[in-house]
Amino acid sequence: MKRNLLSSAIIVAIMSLGLTGCDDKKAETETLPPANSQPAAPAPEAKPTEAPVAKAEAKPETPAQPVVDEQAVFDEKMDVYIKCYNKLQIPVQRSLARYADWLKDFKQGPTGEERTVYGIYGISESNLAECEKGVKSAVALTPALQPIDGVAVSYIDAAVALGNTINEMDKYYTQENYKDDAFAKGKTLHQTFLKNLEAFEPVAESYHAAIQEINDKRQLAELKNIEEREGKTFHYYSLAVMISAKQINNLISQDKFDAEAAMKKVSELETLVAQAKEADKGGMNFSFINSAGQYQLEAKKYVRRIRDKVPYSDWDKEQLQDANSSWMVEDSFPRALREYNEMVDDYNSLR
């Protein structure tokens, strides 16, 4: 159980994409008249009425309803959904890894015979409160954005329930109250925790998949918009780097993948990073370019190891089973993933 839990503790931070250029987007959706079309004939002038009394009795016109900018609403929703995923999901997984680290049997929980008790990492209460309010407010915005709206409330409800239980556990272990009640409350909290976790995991997967489905399309559309508005600027290359990196990460995260195809994609990413560096006049975005280069390098080293069938030592294999130390293993996916998440953080800081 512990091994299965830790293997699922690999979470990828999601890129936030603040779309700009709403006027350009609107212009793209408007249909232009054919080049040989004739201008529309002017409407005939309305004749003045001869019955002013009748005019006064006419019913007032219904005020025009404000036009809803659907793209702006969708962008607002996705911004909230992505930020809250990044604020909650990774901390939850770190908490799970910390808790599992000292339990002999994760499903059974604490027995009271443990020699070492590490407790569990708490979840930011302010993040829980802000995201609960933010996500539910975003869902209420119209028009609806599917499939994400349909799962967002379920996700945040499950995340808050799990987070509150984790925080109660954190307080219990921080105060070392298990020394006073022989783990009685710890065992009770563990059962509540398992119930919350069982409800959380499937909706978290659905939420993540829905975000990725929508965000992938948004990123490709925005990349095209940037090129049309600005040309291939740093703004363009930074997003191109992220799209390429995500494709690589999705590929090499699989148990089995085509190493030659992966290496080709890594080479393409290396070129994009170099182009982004060239476009970064004045070196103002060094942190992002550096982290992108680090991810490209770690991904290449991992793919090379798989391609050349270089085995891991017994020590490495043991470390790879521990979510807290797996990233320390050279030429491994967890190490590449750590650099990927650092790069995502740096990219989000650009916005």
UniProtKB/Swiss-Prot annotation:
InterPro entries: DUF3829 (IPR024291). Residues 33-55 have a biased composition (Low complexity). It comes from the Bacteria. Residues 25-67 are annotated as: Disordered. This is Uncharacterized protein YiiG. It comes from Escherichia coli (strain K12). The lineage of its organism: Bacteria, Pseudomonadati, Pseudomonadota, Gammaproteobacteria, Enterobacterales.
